From Swiss-Prot:
This is Bengalin. GO terms for cellular component: extracellular region. The lineage of its organism: Eukaryota, Metazoa, Ecdysozoa, Arthropoda, Chelicerata. One of its GO terms (biological process) is apoptotic process. The keyword Glycoprotein does not apply. Toxin that shows cardiotoxicity on isolated guinea pig heart and auricle and neurotoxicity on isolated rat phrenic nerve diaphragm. Shows antiosteoporosis activity in experimental rats. Also induces apoptosis against human leukemic cells (U937 and K562). Has no effect on normal human lymphocytes. Apoptosis has been evidenced from damaged nuclei, cell cycle arrest at sub G1 phase, increase of early apoptotic cells, augmentation of DNA fragmentation and also a reduction of telomerase activity.
Amino acid sequence: GPLTILHINDVHAAFEQFNT
């Protein structure tokens, strides 16, 4: 996601998808 304070949330969401 964009380089923002919520960028951590974006990364977390991506990991959640990989974590099936």
